[in-house]
């Protein structure tokens, strides 16, 4: 399946694809941003570097590559921006030089057909050396989805927030990554909403997106059963194990290359895997839309059921009491990490939740997360707001009652 490409889409065209829950590529927008027109492109002369001139001494949280600490995108570490940026610049210019050398070698080969064998040998040696140098100089850190409003206010005027996110006071999130970097299979979400619509804009570089329609691939990917990771797939697309996940054999993929100056609309609950093909700088925007929210209570409800089942089957004993206390505090607005019923001290209350995930799911704030969009001020007077909240809340409560019945009939054993 090919996805549509639309130049400077109107509001009506955005709405059409949001309601269809279909991705499309946007052109003619990003390439008009100040950031795209040379401002964010690294200068060969480091003294003229724009980012260093305004961000050099800023402390930022970065992700450390290759360290498995149970964090999906890598271990978080705070470092000075200049340390990160100088290393990324080095990687960027190494890549550009390698690309230019390959282009020159190809031109030389075309002009010197009589020396093909020698040229090919030299090219292979040069390419091997360039690849080794590029690998050796890959950054140790990368930026993953840092809110620009929070960490990089100096950059706010360098890009245009698309109309719908802007109406909702949503700002952009900055990504700065290296060649061959992978973001594993997932769909977009927030802590208060299990499914978000999104836009991904590339200012520098290219990325490969592997997209999976949630309707076509409804039973292909099992969710992780860990708090904060329910939007992530257990199936590793880069190292597929079809013996462990036989259902994944049936997936249907849409593969696209998103180029510099283009933006991709990623609809709600679409699974996607991302590979960075070149050193890249990107901005993404998440937003809500009542039209696509309504899909969660009908044709996308199966994914909400899978989400609920993942929470229900979570092994809460693997979560530390301190972390679990924060979860309960968030869901109950109780500073003591309790449930407000006065039944036992903090640790006893936490243990009650650990022993019964259904108790966690029944908390009003957790149930309300499925209709989180109705709290968005822009939807205050939307005619379908109350309908959506009623429908999705009813479905979640029905799921809870059915699960209780299964437990009472001993069809389910709570671990």
From Swiss-Prot:
SUPFAM superfamilies: Clavaminate synthase-like. It comes from the Eukaryota. Pfam families: Cupin_8. InterPro entries: Cupin_8 (IPR041667), JmjC_dom (IPR003347). GO terms for molecular function: 2-oxoglutarate-dependent dioxygenase activity. Residues 104-137 have a biased composition (Low complexity). Residues 97-140 are annotated as: Disordered. Residues 127-302 form the JmjC domain. This is JmjC domain-containing protein C. It comes from Dictyostelium discoideum (Social amoeba). The gene is jcdC.
